[in-house]
């Protein structure tokens, strides 16, 4: 019953803001400035049957998710290293702070000096994910019960048993929450990199073309696509992570 109430409340909120959008579009009366949600949906449905739509979606998804995967792997290794070695913690702290504080646009422009536009979204997605998951994994490691760690050392448990009994139950909840945040960030930053780098056949390139041709309907349609891809991949990844957690630990990590 509570789930149904929550669903209807959220659906009602969505309908309310769509109505506000529709009224604003009708009041302005100029599609160049603001298209209605109905027109944006029509434009999106017109894009879907086209082959280049799927090519662009696949091109951008592949590179952004590659950047995310690299961020997951590198941040996990660096977080474990920083927690086990004070010298590594000292060396990595200013780097992570720098990455967090530097604007995405600055990274994109600087990165264009070293990498081609086709690889730019991979690098930028990786850089934006890195400090988020680095902090999340470190938070999880620090939450491990010291008594459990001591017990594992006393009984000389093998590494596989330590991971399942001590480390993963503590790290996975923080890691899951970090991934939820990082996936949204990497999509926004990755598409921003494509808009500036303009690799052919990308979603960012389509957004830029829609902007310079004043095709506001396409601009909103591609924005819908980005939102749907981001939300869809986030739900899929978290579902796979929960399934893996059940297989390894017998339970889903509680965030």
Task: Locate the predicted segments by residue.
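Generic hydrophobic transmembrane alpha-helix motif, especially the helices
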Residues: 97-132, 139
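Transmembrane alpha-helices
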Residues: 123, 127, 160-193, 221, ...
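Non-cytoplasmic
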Residues: 178-228
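Transmembrane-helix boundary motif in ABC transporter permease subunits
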Residues: 66-96, 109
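N-terminal signal-anchor transmembrane alpha helix
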Residues: 5-28
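Short cytoplasmic-facing helical segments at TM-TM junctions of multi-pass membrane proteins
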Residues: 136-175, 207
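C-terminal transmembrane helix and the adjacent membrane-cytosol boundary/short C-terminal tail
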Residues: 86, 177, 221-255
